[in-house]
Amino acid sequence: MYEYIKGTLTHINESYVVIESFGIGYAIMLSERFSVDLRAFMHQEVLIYVHSVIRETEHVLYGFSSRAEKECFRLLISFSGIGPKTGLSILNMFPLQELCSIARLENVKAIASVPGIGKKTAEKLMVDLKQKLPTLMPLYLEEPVVPSSTANSSFKEGIGALMNLGFSRLAADRMMTEAVKELSEEASVAELLPIALRKS
């Protein structure tokens, strides 16, 4: 299984790119949004995180801009009724932050707007996403680094992340305070957020 492919971007369109590495051209399926971002790097070296889907008659690589996005894709396709193409369509429409917000607000209508997802599938997916929100949040934080100084930095960053998801400042402060009490003042924001979300 590949973690990522690093090489020269030799071809690009709205659904896939070709990366040449050591004389081999890898065709990688990706979202239209990511494709647009890559156009500025034609004939340059790029690094794309990949997930392999191997079937009896085909071997498909799906590409992502970050490890976090890749892990979110893997989470999505673990849900019943969500295949790789649908998972990619979801990430094309909703960046990680927005997907977290959709899950918290149980916005079935937003999920149902994704091509290939009907109302019943959207309702079921929403239940799954809501349960996995503590897993999604650290992914949204893009592999957070250790706070620069004290635990106060983690506390403030956590409040900001919760407010981005639609919580009020007062609610976010309460949730983070309870999370710190449960863990410790030295805990990272990635450790605190899943606990904080359970306090909502």
Curated annotation (Swiss-Prot):
MF terms in GO: ATP binding; four-way junction DNA binding; four-way junction helicase activity
Paired cysteines (S-S): none
GO biological process: DNA recombination; DNA repair
Classification via CDD domains: UBA_RuvA_C
Keyword terms of this UniProt record: Cytoplasm, DNA damage, DNA recombination, DNA repair, DNA-binding
Spans annotated as Domain II: 66-144
UniProt-annotated stretches for the region Domain III: 150-200
UniProt region (Domain I), positions on chain: 1-65
Compartment annotation: Cytoplasm
InterPro entries in the record: DNA_helicase_Holl-junc_RuvA_I (IPR013849), Hlx-hairpin-Hlx_DNA-bd_motif (IPR003583), NA-bd_OB-fold (IPR012340), RuvA (IPR000085), RuvA_2-like (IPR010994), RuvA_C (IPR011114)
Location of the region described as Flexible linker in the Swiss-Prot/TrEMBL record: 145-149
Superkingdom of origin organism: Bacteria
GO cellular component, one term: cytoplasm
Primary residence: cytoplasm
Stated family: Belongs to the RuvA family.
HAMAP family: DNA_HJ_migration_RuvA
Domains (record comment): Has three domains with a flexible linker between the domains II and III and assumes an 'L' shape. Domain III is highly mobile and contacts RuvB.
Annotated function: The RuvA-RuvB-RuvC complex processes Holliday junction (HJ) DNA during genetic recombination and DNA repair, while the RuvA-RuvB complex plays an important role in the rescue of blocked DNA replication forks via replication fork reversal (RFR). RuvA specifically binds to HJ cruciform DNA, conferring on it an open structure. The RuvB hexamer acts as an ATP-dependent pump, pulling dsDNA into and through the RuvAB complex. HJ branch migration allows RuvC to scan DNA until it finds its consensus sequence, where it cleaves and resolves the cruciform DNA.
Protein name: Holliday junction branch migration complex subunit RuvA
Organism: Chlamydia trachomatis serovar A (strain ATCC VR-571B / DSM 19440 / HAR-13)
